[in-house]
Amino acid sequence: MVDTLPTPKHAPLAGVIGWPVAHSRSPRLHGHWLERYGIAGHYVSLPVMPEHLAEVLRAMPHMGFVGANVTIPHKESVLALADVVTDRAALIGAANTLIFRADGKIHADNTDGYGFIANIRQHAPDWIPDLGPAAVIGAGGAARAVVASLLESGVPELRIANRTRIRAEQIRAEFGAKVVVYDWAQAGNMLEGAMTVVNATSMGMEGKPPLRVPLEALAPSTLVTDLVYTPLMTPFLAEAQARGCEVVDGLGMLLHQAAPGFERWFGQRPEVDDDLRRAVLA
């Protein structure tokens, strides 16, 4: 509810909105940057029930908030509540970053795709996306951001498989002819010849079932990445690495997607480095 929000302060406020939100690493992440750059700002967790979302969002700009991150289950809902929605957020169908303008208007953006690509480029600097097809496992909200960013980066073909095929078909309908849909039972086959492979599901996360996709078709030249970062080295990445592939864990996507929002809210472009990784994992 609105009356649980922090009292306005002279220092700018930002936070993460979700339900639940106690698990979020965003306060630790942004807190590290605020301390590192000596910024007199605050970043807080905001547990907001879905039925209170609109009320809270409209109140926040008047309480000293300059913006917010958005997590489950509000990433789709905020699009209808924002005054301005970026093209990429509209295409993906979700927003993870809100900017509260001085005139009270709410701008919604999605930086997940940016974070995904920036993570790969930081940890696999020789990656060339247009060398061959990309294969994406999963078709949920995170997958949509990955698909958009890979196509924008120039992959010549994007293969996708999802347990519910209709969701993959929806992505093909919205993102165009470069998207090729595979049946879930054929997910292993779509890895043949792929130069980039992404697990965009929650499978393999601690407490979740493992990702059961055959990896025999992986070539050692393939870059393999996983959006899951608990654990950092998922069984999927471990097997790919054992097959000679270069692998990139999912933590960096979380870190990089946060940077554009932090810069807009606090006026400092933050650095994503090993110190930040250690702070977020502590």
Swiss-Prot record:
GO cellular component terms given for this protein = cytosol
Claim: Amino-acid biosynthesis is one of the keywords in the record: yes
Q: Name one GO molecular function term.
A: shikimate 3-dehydrogenase (NADP+) activity
Assembly behavior: Homodimer.
* Disulfide linkage: none
Record SUPFAM superfamilies: Aminoacid dehydrogenase-like, N-terminal domain, NAD(P)-binding Rossmann-fold domains
Pathway recorded for this protein? Metabolic intermediate biosynthesis; chorismate biosynthesis; chorismate from D-erythrose 4-phosphate and phosphoenolpyruvate: step 4/7
Statement: the UniProt record of this protein carries the keyword Oxidoreductase: yes
Organism source for this protein? Answer: Paracoccus denitrificans (strain Pd 1222)
What is the name of the protein in this document?
Shikimate dehydrogenase (NADP(+))
